[in-house]
């Protein structure tokens, strides 16, 4: 970890400033867009449906990722981690919970959309609430395991944020990684791809699918794939042989996912977009109520 007034190994002054600035921009953009999405759900009755509850879960998870990025950005600009080892464990846990919840919520939204548009039965509240509860409980379970000894949280190469420690590459890390990745990356990615593919096949014959069926899977793959590749490399070789700057790239890419998700799921939905606009325009909302 970089101490106060010193630069992390492998980074120059401008590089540390650049990483901190990028993280800050990603954090603020992700927070602002996802908080607006959450407010639109709370204040717009039309959005209080089981299907939109899944999108709300995704927005909450992405807000958590952005908060995690904000802490990392602040520490990067300070050029040190000011919260101690316990703060590092808490930061790693919170970031891992929200990352897994975001990935699994994306899969839940994909399944919910397929269920809504391609089946005759509507998604009910019991199913939606149970699904959201399962996503968050499962994410908390997997994120807690490194705190209990299966896996480990440690500082990232910049020394100003914390994540799953991949530098050891031992049997403990390898067994945790492959098990966790199957249930929390490969399986959600499979559900997302299959759900939207089935939507294209069923709805494409008669009309254009009402939602973007390509971007969600690409976001999962491109947003979290670099982390998966880095972790996979760490199981077969010494990850420290990769330059510290290159090791930070997956983190910077992943922190952009909340902004992309908000633009796709919220701003890309006419109803959610209308709800956000009503939150930003109180007079318009009052006028709509009078009508």
From Swiss-Prot:
GO terms for molecular function: G protein-coupled photoreceptor activity. It is a multi-pass membrane protein. It comes from the Eukaryota. The modification N6-(retinylidene)lysine is found at residue 255. Preferentially expressed at high levels in the retinal pigment epithelium (RPE) and Mueller cells of the neural retina. GO terms for cellular component: plasma membrane. Disulfide bonds join 88-162. It is found in: Membrane. One of its GO terms (biological process) is visual perception. InterPro entries: GPCR_opsins, GPCR_Rhodpsn, GPCR_Rhodpsn_7TM, Retinal_BS, RPE_GPCR. Covalently binds all-trans- and 11-cis-retinal. Residues 1-15, 74-91, 152-175, 241-247 are extracellular. Residues 37-52, 113-130, 197-219, 269-291 are cytoplasmic. Keywords: Chromophore, Disulfide bond, G-protein coupled receptor, Glycoprotein, Membrane, Photoreceptor protein, Receptor, Retinal protein, Sensory transduction, Transducer, Transmembrane, Transmembrane helix, Vision. Glycans are attached at residue 172. It holds the Pfam family 7tm_1. Belongs to the G-protein coupled receptor 1 family. Opsin subfamily. Receptor for all-trans- and 11-cis-retinal. Binds preferentially to the former and may catalyze the isomerization of the chromophore by a retinochrome-like mechanism. This is RPE-retinal G protein-coupled receptor. It comes from Bos taurus. The lineage of its organism: Eukaryota, Metazoa, Chordata, Craniata, Vertebrata.
